Amino acid sequence: MTTTGTTAFNLEMNDLIEEAFERCGLELRTGYDFRTARRSLNILTIEWANRGINLWTVEQGQIVMNTQQALYALPIDTIDILDASTRTNNGSQSNQVDINLSRISEPTYMTIPNKNTTGRPVQMFVNRQSGGVASTPQTTLVGGISSTDNTITLASVANLPTQGFVNIGSETIAYQNIVGNQIVNAWRGQNGTTAAVHLTGVSVFNNQLPCINVWPTPNPPGNQYTLVYYRMRRIQDGGTGVRTQDIPFRFIPCMVAGLAYYLANKLPGVDPNRVPMLKAEYEQQFQLAADEDREKASIRFVPRNLFYS
């Protein structure tokens, strides 16, 4: 007998939700059933982010650095940074060099006396912000700014952190200092946006982007360094009924089992005796998938011998 020769099996959201309902002993019948299941599915993927590193969400990113800029924005869906380095001669086959950035904590970063010291960056503090943009403006511009101005006068700075990011129009601006009512040492066009002209009175919004603080700050000209990092991103949202999910095929049994357990906790027609069984099945399926979704490189532990005389 011949086999199909295909390995493309996947579940669209409609089928995934229907399978989860059947495991609860129910049938998917109404539009509300679909909406409540989709909501639970999105919550489920957020839970997975709290369980550890999901290897399929690990991505590399690069940022060209600037002279004396310590603060670098990360994509808004960043959960954490796994590793980072500063690279010189980016793209050169003969002399590209990466030097690892050592991760330090916020208290350790605060103990650095002069955070504006220049040199090749060797340390980083990862500031894991929410990525949310304020829904109401914190302040407004006083006087217009060109696309190259790095000093920005505001009506008030009372509601702004002394270091961070702001959105003006469609532009994201990084800044490292506030003096009086002015943002000084601003870095324009951050996080994939373009520096633009802004008129007086325009609203200014606080943007809580996840970011990296490096030390020392890059020495001139600055752009000889490229910040190279591996990050863990969020799992993409469930989407509509004809979409497949942002997971490898190995996690399909786990996702179905997890959604069935989530639904069993809130749907009134589920037999209460099913809930412990569905929870146990979910935990087993997640453990099976997580055990496979791991690094398989060899690790060697060597004891450190210390001698006292």
Predicted regions and their residues:
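Autoprocessing Asn-cyclization modules and mimics
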Residues: L55-V64, I99-S102, Q129-N206
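Glycine-enriched, solvent-exposed interface loops adjoining structured elements
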Residues: M1-T136, F205-S309
